[in-house]
């Protein structure tokens, strides 16, 4: 639960106007892969949680959303794609380079954009992997303002392989944002 997405509302005052801003803190891109693979409808995931938080914030009539990815070291690539679909109507989210050098777009969205209001994404030097993919997609599609320091710069896709006494992690691809190479 410490890694689960959380929301709060803040009020920002400007001369002659105040703004209600929803802040979603996302410490990790998580997904219950076991429940998902068993086709359990109510599996836990960051994209499902953020979708519910966005619905609540829309009902609360916020003027904009801040998505806080500071300290988020990444997680599920599938969740980065699923979360991007909530904000970006269509287009590829990221490109991956295979070991043979071929580049393939991943995460082509064709879904309904759940939130189309103003968005700001906060990043820092600890924002890595899936965080960088999401922030890069927002940058590519000019979907929101990216604020903070340079991110970690991971740029690789990894896969876990189960062994009889643990797991081994393989780096199998490099990732690039879609419109500009990292």
Feature locations, PLM:
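Short acidic, Pro/Gly- and aromatic-enriched capping/linker segments at domain boundaries
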Residues: 164-173
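Conserved small/polar residues in nucleotide/adenosyl-binding loops
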Residues: 181-182
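Cleft-lining beta-strand/loop regions that shape enzyme active-site pockets
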Residues: 1-164
């Amino acid at each position: 639960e410490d890694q689960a997405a959380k929301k709060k509302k803040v009020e920002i005052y400007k001369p002659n106007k105040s703004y209600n801003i929803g802040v979603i803190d996302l410490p990790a891109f998580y997904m219950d892969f076991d429940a998902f693979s068993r086709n359990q409808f109510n599996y836990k995931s960051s994209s499902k949680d953020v979708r519910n938080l966005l619905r609540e914030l829309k009902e609360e009539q916020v003027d904009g959303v801040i998505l806080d990815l500071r300290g988020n070291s990444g997680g599920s690539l599938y969740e980065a794609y699923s979360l991007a679909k909530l904000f970006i109507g269509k287009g590829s989210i990221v490109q991956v380079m295979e070991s043979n050098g071929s580049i393939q777009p991943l995460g082509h969205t064709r879904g309904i954009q759940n939130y189309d209001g103003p968005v700001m994404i906060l990043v820092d030097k600890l924002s890595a992997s899936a965080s960088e993919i999401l922030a890069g997609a927002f940058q590519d599609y000019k979907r929101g303002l990216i604020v903070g320091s340079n991110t970690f710069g991971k740029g690789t896709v990894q896969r876990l392989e189960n062994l009889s006494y643990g797991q081994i992690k393989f780096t199998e691809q490099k990732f690039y944002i879609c419109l500009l190479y990292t």
